[in-house]
Amino acid sequence: MLFASGEQAYVAAQVLDTRFTPDGADPGWADEVVASLGAGERAMCALSFAAGAPGLAHRVVGSEHALQRFEQGPDVDRSYDVTEFPTPDEYAAMVRTALERIATGALHKVVLGRCLDVVSEPPLVPAEIIDRLLTTRPGRYVFSVPLVSGSADGTAPDDGPILVGASPELLVRREGLEISCTPLAGSVPRSADPDEDARRAAGLQESGKDLAEHAFVVEAIVHALKEVCVEIEYPATPELLSTDTVWHLATPIHARLAAGADGPSALRLAQLLHPTPAVGGVPTAAANAVIADLEGDLRDWFAGCVGWVDADGDGEFAVTIRAAVMDGPRLRLFAGAGIVAGSDPASEVRETGAKLATMARVTGLP
């Protein structure tokens, strides 16, 4: 179990207990999690996408150190059975339906996702996937969090589903009174040709559609932060942030807790901000209704958030994108794209395909 940020990783050595909740948005549960922590302990947490959906927190002790790779055995020849759902054509139809609803004025933006199910023989090994994520770094925030309780001896469970990934998106970080967020919204697939790659990056910065999509997210986060923060600062125009497969528009936001050290913990802040329009939409309720209608129960833990909090309330949470759920031989990947007026269904299929490719490569798929 680990959470890596930049070049540092926190690795849990022992799981003391696990607290589940049927509603990851419950602030009382978050307060109980933080209150349960002793000196030197952290809670490694995961929240589902939807309000009223599960959350969990593993109370752990561990250590923080420079990133290092896991020891691996020899390469293993594997066969893969890959299922894409919805299919690209079905996803394009979902986008068209969303655009029709946007045209009525019922909503301004909605994020729609699709999945890959990968079944490998022999089964993939979690440490192998984490090692590849730490090596390739498709996102700054690498994580591995079991979705079941730890073993009786205090170790992480040997079986059961595990949430793994490498997210490029910081939901929130609390360091004392300092609060940071870096929302991403608006993206374009990268190109292997340097000139074309630069052209795409420049085009993204000038895209009215993508800038509008990004503005929805920044406005929502700033509005939420005003409930608990002062001195909120952010640039007038977004920056470019790149992964190995995608260019993103990003806006770094900084603020200070208004209530000082008695302000909300990092876990409470994650609940306050999540889900942002970067994974949901605007207005929130209307977008969530469209997501439930068109996606069904596709998301589960995807497009949620994952991270840690300590006894002082400090911590760091990333948005659960560029992620997979591993369960035995099966690995499910998820990627989404923001749909606004002017979105092109074929372009959104390509964008989600590029995002899925980030995680597909770490499974060993060509």
Place the predicted regions along the sequence by residue.
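Short alpha-helical segments and helix-capping/turn motifs at coil-helix boundaries
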Residues: 25-36, 41-42, 94-98, 128, ...
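A generic N-terminal leader/anchor concept
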Residues: 1-52
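Flexible glycine-rich active-site/ligand-binding loops centered on an Asp-His dyad
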Residues: 105
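A short glycine-rich, hydrophobically flanked beta-strand micro-motif that places a catalytic Asp/Glu
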Residues: 43-47, 110, 142-145, 300-307
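Contiguous alpha-helical scaffold segments within structured protein domains
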Residues: 6-14, 21-22, 52, 56, ...
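An anion-binding catalytic pocket shared by soluble metabolic enzymes
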Residues: 2-19, 114-212, 216, 227-233, ...
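Conserved hydrophobic core element of enzyme catalytic domains
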Residues: 255-366
